[in-house]
Amino acid sequence: MYTPIPQSGSPFPASVQDPGLHIWRVEKLKPVPIARESHGIFFSGDSYLVLHNGPEEASHLHLWIGQQSSRDEQGACAVLAVHLNTLLGERPVQHREVQGNESDLFMSYFPRGLKYYREGGVESAFHKTTSGARGAAIRKLYQVKGKKNIRATERPLSWDSFNTGDCFILDLGQNIFAWCGGKSNILERNKARDLALAIRDSERQGKAQVEIITDGEEPAEMIQVLGPKPALKEGNPEEDITADQTRPNAQAAALYKVSDATGQMNLTKVADSSPFASELLIPDDCFVLDNGLCAQIYIWKGRKANEKERQAALQVADGFISRMRYSPNTQVEILPQGRESPIFKQFFKNWK
């Protein structure tokens, strides 16, 4: 059990201190808890908070941003993250996760992979898919990508969405088909099967029929839903590499000091390239470690830095990404002093 924290006026329950995984969807600027059986299901139109409390009070707080989520929703998610982080005594390492570019740590919470819905919000298809009474009316198609980090993304219900190099899941409610392209490999096929079984168990209470389909042996029910099967395009192997890649640790990183002495957040470069001297990290300040060319930005928060600087860490990261014209998919990791990751430490030549 984590150290009790005052809950006065908090939108989060006292259980946020419990070990394990906690997930909230941002809904009308409030956090709405996600039931355990729905963990791993994300809507592209929404933003989420994912908190993992591990042993020895080692917490990680992830902000998951859907590709179609609004700026208002993303802003509300950031505000709630600041509140939750403060509630937990600023212990968590914070991460910004963008749909389709999640970190390996985030993916490790969901061993059966992630499933993305195109729709989002309270009135979305989420309620339809969890309702057994409407199970027969469900018609959804998912493309399964990645050999290590599995992501299932909802696609238009058409043969045009298929290719011969990937696996797809056609969810018809009472029947779930895992279709495997002729050029997909055995690992991908096994992952597609596992994901189809996970849909059956979590969304149909184990009562749907799962069938593995080989390219060219489509049953009549698939043809009835999708129409006559045309010649299919080939897959793109680069997409699997992107889904599975672990971003390299570039040596050409830079280090910036964050200051609000003028009333605004300003950045001053203190080192042009790594490895850096660890003495550059002063406990009274916050710093940006720029590894943006490898799609990664780190914010280090000194334990004596003022509250405004610490709480603005995510805002500083977003502004830095825009200023440097980095990809919006750039991952952000916010590290309190004393919670530095091994990857972060590799940028320093004399870490103690």
Swiss-Prot record:
Taxonomically, the superkingdom here is Eukaryota
Q: Which CDD domains match?
A: gelsolin_S1_like (cd11290), gelsolin_S2_like (cd11289), gelsolin_S3_like (cd11292)
What are the UniProt keywords, alphabetically? Acetylation, Actin capping, Actin-binding, Cell projection, Cytoplasm, Nucleus, Phosphoprotein, Repeat
Q: Which Gene3D superfamilies match?
A: Severin (3.40.20.10)
Residue positions where N-acetylmethionine is found in the record: M1
**Keyword field contains ATP-binding:** no
What are the protein's GO molecular function terms? actin filament binding
Q: Which Pfam families match?
A: Gelsolin (PF00626)
| One GO BP | cell projection assembly
Expressed, tissue-wise, as follows: Present in a large variety of tissues and is particularly abundant in kidney and lung. Highly expressed in macrophages (at protein level).
Post-translational modification remark: Phosphorylated. Nuclear GCAP39 is more highly phosphorylated than cytoplasmic GCAP39.
Query: Which parts of the sequence carry Phosphoserine?
Result: S341
Q: Which GO terms describe its cellular component?
A: lamellipodium; melanosome; nucleus; phagocytic vesicle; ruffle
Annotated Gelsolin-like repeats reside at: 27-75, 150-190, 265-311
Localization, per the record, is: Nucleus; Cytoplasm; Melanosome; Cell projection, Lamellipodium
Q: Does the keyword Ribosomal protein apply?
A: no
SMART domains for this protein: GEL (SM00262)
- InterPro entries on file: ADF-H/Gelsolin-like_dom_sf, Gelsolin-like_dom, Villin/Gelsolin
Identify the residue span(s) of motif Nuclear localization signal.
139-148
The task this protein performs is described as: Calcium-sensitive protein which reversibly blocks the barbed ends of actin filaments but does not sever preformed actin filaments. May play an important role in macrophage function. May play a role in regulating cytoplasmic and/or nuclear structures through potential interactions with actin. May bind DNA. Uncapping occurs either when Ca(2+) falls or when the concentration of polyphosphoinositide rises, both at low and high Ca(2+).
Family (UniProt) = Belongs to the villin/gelsolin family.
Q: How does it assemble?
A: Interacts with NUP62. Interacts with NUTF2 and RAN; involved in CAPG nuclear import.
Q: What is this protein called?
A: Macrophage-capping protein
Organism listed in the record: Mus musculus
